[in-house]
Amino acid sequence: MIKVFQINFFFLCLLLFLFACSEHKKEEGGISASSQIKDPDELIKLAVGKQTTGAYDEAIDILNQVLEVNSLYAPAHYQKGLIYEEWDRRKESLASYNKAVEINPTYNEARLGLASLYDKSVLNELALEQYLKVAETRRDDPGIHFKIALEYWYLQDIPKAAEHYIRVVEINPEHLQAHLNLISVYESMKNWGKALEEIVVVKRLSQKTNNQQATSIAENKLKFIKGRMNLTKKDIKRKSEPPFD
């Protein structure tokens, strides 16, 4: 019995040794493969492949190979920023995005990366600054204007939020979320007429797309606004501030 156990233990150790050797060869193969590639864009693709499998450290090593040859290759810095952000290493991600923008001030993807990081840290003014920079070259991008409007809303600059939501629906009249948000913006501005107009648009678009949630929100907003329209400032204050009637 002891002899059988010793034999089994020997084979187990042998299998573990062979597995370790196999893994080591794989790692060496990966390193040699990246060292044989000279095209920086191909190396970045290889790094992205590593990133998708969660091998962040290997991906960063590959990108560092690119930067050893050309430290001013902005796409490599940008990709490092993406990897570090996904890895939840914000400090390193911030440094990488900033480096990409420093090298190429019109690198919009890197600026959007910075804005994403600032949003996660609730640094809305800094995020807004990056979105506005991107908007200089992407004037007709509804997605960018939507993000700008959101930042202004968070900063409680309501007129500016309205301005950019309006720009969104000018570019894309069927942008349902922008119309929904405009209801809240006009409600905040006590511009009941405009709010009612947006409710009509939202109900039309939501019926067209069978979006029951948007329809429900619009109907609830309609009830709320109708209840507020004919109230005096004194009435509104009495109903919205304690002690409540």
Predicted regions, residues:
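Terminal, low-structured helical/coil segments at or just beyond the last alpha-helical repeat
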Residues: 21-32, 188, 192, 196-245
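Structural marker of alpha-solenoid helical repeat scaffolds
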Residues: 69, 103, 137-138, 171, ...
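Helix-start (N-cap) detector for alpha-helical repeat units in TPR-like alpha-solenoids
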Residues: 33, 39-41, 74-75, 108-109, ...
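Structural signature of tandem alpha-helical TPR/SEL1-like repeats
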Residues: 52-62, 86-99, 120-133, 155-167, ...
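Alpha-helical segment of the N-proximal tetratricopeptide repeat
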Residues: 36-72, 82-86
